[in-house]
Amino acid sequence: MSGTKWTEEQLSAITTRDCNLLVAAAAGSGKTAVLVERIIKIITNEENPIDIDKLLVVTFTSAAAAEMRERIANAISKKLDETPTSKNLQKQLTLLNRSNIMTIHSFCLGVIKNNFHKIDLDPSFRICDQTEGILLKMEIIDELFDDKYDEENQEFIKFIEAFSSYKSDNALKELVLSLYNFTMAGPWPKKWLKDASRDFDIKTLQELDETKWVNVLKESIKIELDGYIKMMQKAVKLINETDGLEPYFEGFSSELDLIVNAYNNVESSLNDLYNSLNLITFNRLKTIKKNTVSDENIQNLVKQIRDQVKKKISALIEGTFIASPDKMLDNIIKSYPYINQLTELTSEFIDRFTAKKKEKNILDFNDLEHLCLKILIEENEENQIVPSTIAQKFKDYFEEVLVDEYQDSNNVQEAIIELVSRKNSDNPNVFMVGDVKQSIYKFRQAKPELFIDKYNSYSLDKGINRKIQLYKNFRSREEIINGVNYIFKSVMSKTVGELEYTDVEALNLGANYPEKKNDDDIIGGPIEVHILDRSDNKEENDEFKLQAEEEIGDVNLEARIIVKRINELISKKEGNKFKVLDKDTGEYRDLKYKDIVILLRATKNWSEVLLDELGLAGIPVYADTGSGYFESIEIRTIMSLLKVIDNPMQDVPMLSLLISPIIGLSAEELSDIRLIDKEKYFYENIIKISKEKLISVELQEKCEYILSSIDKWRRKSIYMPIDEFIWYLYMDTAYYGYVGAMPNGVLRQANLKILFQRARQFSDTSFKGLFNFINFINKLTKSSGDMGSAKILGENEDVIRIMSIHKSKGLEFPVVFLAGCGKNFNLMDLNNKILYHEELGLGPEYINLENRTSITTLPKEAIKKRMKLETLSEEMRVLYVAFTRAKEKLIITGAVRNAEKSIEKWINSAVLDKDVVLPYEISKGKSYLDWIGMALCKHKDGEILRKKLGFSSEMCKDDLSMWKISIWNKYELDMYDELDENQEEEDVKISILDKDVNKEIKSEVYRRLGYEYEFKESTKLTSNISVSDLKKRNIEDDIDTLKMFDLEEEDNKNKDIITPKFLQEEKGISAAERGTAIHFAMKKIDFSKVGTLKEIKEQLNKLYDEELILQEEYNSINPYKILSFFKSSLGKKMLYVYNEGGKVYREVPFYTEISSLEIDESLPQKYANEKIRLQGIIDCFFKCDDEIILLDYKTDYVENEEEFKDKYKNQLSYYSEAIFKMTGKKVDKKYLYSFYLEKEILI
């Protein structure tokens, strides 16, 4: 660290002492390095060193705390290398193990453990997991409502009638739980509830005028009227500058005066404001004769501006003043009993939940902060809340309190920091570092206002409260820096963004990117914006385009643009290659897939499509989703199965089950079942069909099978623990094997394992049974507890990552695609019946029980307006985070319904001010693309936007940023992408046919149904079969291997159910599992580090550390065997190809067609044209000395080498055929490598 060249501002942040110091550290400014160096300087100060355990360092995550410790340890160790006799350094390295570098929750837990007696807590308490916490809440909320019903309290009954649905009170229970979670983010939840209720206890208009709600409404109205005034002023200016528009001047000026008058009355009483707004009228414009106006475009523009203002003022009055002030007051008064009931229910829930946790001697994460707070405060003689003696000890002990990611703190955490530090004393000692422009956790109740208040009040000069700004970015190229500054100077403001983005906040270039050495190379370049126009081209409406419109969704089309640019960036042609800077060598190199990330605001509904489209194009890709687990097809299918077993009288899950591979009915069969009796449930109709031959014998037999299966599963569910029952279903239905054979099968099976593990956690609680488990999962699905898919990828895999912007925070990538920018912001929460806000309290609808009508209230409208601005501000910061992830290239994509209309809207917003887009216009934006488009309409590179509507370049402003804007018609994009025969990526994903895979297990299920018809021989054939199964001589051998799944032999099957690794006790893994583990290792291993046993062991350790292989799998892999392969002549040949820059293709999936007679020669000749889809995964192939060499790894026990060769001969033939279809080149040599024999075998 001592060799680092610090900037002047960084040095100030490192060395400034004896004050509260706020460091505003922009993206890429070296925040963490500065924080670590400050700590090092403090503990190694020659004159007054401070022990590291006397510092409290609060981090946002445990991972950040661990990284901080590691960095400090490395820094101390380096200093020890320089001065090995330093006793202080040796002492600090020792003290580091007990240092207070931790999350706020860890700190609170330590305070509680050391002071449990102060709060009457049993010291043997434990922290409950999420599962147990959710189940307890469900139990308590049910008990609470049951008790309230028993009391027959009329106010409660009216509350239920007003806010529950006709069928249940679940929505109201959810409301109480949601409000509980919200209030627990504040320091005094029960006080907040009391205050929120008391706010509704008003009687007069004067009292209403003094409320926070009215102030917020006035602020909002002021912003809107200011926008309308500027719009009308712009129109009047254009009228004055344009010959022939003089007749408009008087009317426009008069209307402008009325709006100004209303603006001036904003600070008056609600009644006066209401009246002044209603005085605004728009009379008929005077007529202008044709051909008398010098510029008709200007005439149309001013009329459009006036029409917009007219509509918006009408909407403002109707939306804000939903009634007269008197009537709004009346609605508030009538809503008071409802609000009182809600707050009392929530408060009682808090008490009951607290009592239940005390009874069980458990705490949850909310308790950690609140109990810590309870320990740190006490009442003095004047009944004032003051720091306790324990808090005072912390104040005296900690020499400095350092808070990382301060922009994400909430009010509880702020209170705790104040109580254990000397922040409010004459000897302050708090260091806070963060970037408010990256505060994107408001959904976790983060309070960026805490940072903003200090940023606005702290001084740059000397004083006890100081701030230092770090705005030099050491991450990104100049093109990225300039682009970020241009966009956010244009659109970020105090109104939307909660911070003005001025030259002070702008990023400054700090990274040093060298010039390119080869003129043909491509580096950096302008930021790209690709706009997909979804409108129809009426002049071109042929059959091909209609088909494209029907078959390709908007997300797919946007994905095609991304695929096209990726293929262009990672070009297979010589010359003109896109290069990125290698951070290790300092030289430019070819772009790799792992250098690219695709960022999404939310991955749901997008990541699957992107995976499919990139996969079809042969681009290796992985989606790192933070959610969507419960939306995956395999989890939805199993949950539908569980719901049907619990209660078959549910049509939605029943339908999902019937069409799933578990049952596999056709659309026609489903229709036949439904038409038996449309008024009955599917289950009832299935019963009816099973008893009578109403359709066909086949359907009757299927219905009998469905009923017998459901009956069997229901009986099993009664006595089996839920986790064992779920695994039983996986095996009994063969669904676990089925999803493993689907695309992304490893991930799908991992997802099913997660569900099993979740069921095991559930079994460890006091709640039992299928019904409770389904309810628990439903709660998780509705809450923010969606867990994201299983992790199956290492960080160094050469694949493109797809992730949410939130997941990307703190990361950086050479090339960033920011996709889905045309998607509308999610403002659905603003439509809830009751809104709540930390400052403004509760905002309900008023429900009139007499006529069953609802109407919004003034509190709700006030909260709605504030929440909308806060949500948009959060979105602005999320966009900033996305932009600043890019190091060298940023590519933005987004779709609009109609490009011309969108551009017209952007230009109309942009023309109102030369330098920025007005905050009012930004607040009306519905997507990131709206904001970006408004800004780019004013940029010199936005000519393509202005030209589309005939606008001149006079509105342009000079700027250093460079942009390349493209507008795509949806018909320009090819429907299908062909695989290039010279494709260079290592992990090729090929789909010769479609990707719909039905496996042999499904065929076996149908076989057991006992069909008897003309082509019954073909029932032995699957529509798909894997190559590994073709090593059998005929299909009957395959059927024997599937006996373990026999649905009719229930008793025997229980003995044969495969027990997963995580259910086994003291047992090793199977030979097949061992083989899978070795194959996985051979796919993941880095060929550049296989020269020694140590290197191979290190790579296997890494796979285990990254949780890519389980403990049992890790133990089963013999590193000596892998080293032996690389020492063999075949292994050396492969390494030679790799080291010379050739491509070694590993784990290549494929699908192709073969004749059914190749599967079973005994079939009649009439099946010669019957095709079977063949799928498999080729272990490895590569080109060496103009020969294509195929290699297949085997881990079998080998007794006879010739029999071993004969066993796999056909399998390698199919692989060879697949390689020919992919590359157009024949395989010259086919090898088996036996890890058992440690020998290569030529076939």
UniProtKB/Swiss-Prot annotation:
Domain UvrD-like helicase C-terminal: 512-810
UniProtKB keywords: ATP-binding, DNA damage, DNA repair, DNA-binding, Exonuclease, Helicase, Hydrolase, Isomerase, Nuclease, Nucleotide-binding
Cofactor(s) needed for function: Mg(2+)
Listed EC numbers: 3.1.-.-, 5.6.2.4
GO molecular function, one term: ATP hydrolysis activity
GO cellular component, as recorded: cytosol; DNA helicase complex
Residues annotated as binding ATP: A25, A26, A27, G28, S29, G30, K31, T32
Catalytic activity from the UniProt record: Couples ATP hydrolysis with the unwinding of duplex DNA by translocating in the 3'-5' direction; ATP + H2O = ADP + phosphate + H(+)
Pfam families associated with the record: PDDEXK_1 (PF12705), UvrD-helicase (PF00580), UvrD_C (PF13361)
Swiss-Prot/TrEMBL GO biological process terms: double-strand break repair via homologous recombination
InterPro entries: AddA, DNA_helicase_UvrD-like_C, DNA_helicase_UvrD/REP, P-loop_NTPase, PDDEXK-like_dom_sf, PDDEXK_AddAB-type, Restrct_endonuc-II-like, UvrD-like_ATP-bd
Domain (UvrD-like helicase ATP-binding): residue spans on this chain: 4-477
NCBIfam families hit by this protein: addA_Gpos
Family: Belongs to the helicase family. AddA subfamily.
Subunit structure: Heterodimer of AddA and AddB/RexB.
Described function: The heterodimer acts as both an ATP-dependent DNA helicase and an ATP-dependent, dual-direction single-stranded exonuclease. Recognizes the chi site generating a DNA molecule suitable for the initiation of homologous recombination. The AddA nuclease domain is required for chi fragment generation; this subunit has the helicase and 3' -> 5' nuclease activities.
Protein name as catalogued: ATP-dependent helicase/nuclease subunit A
Gene giving rise to this polypeptide: addA
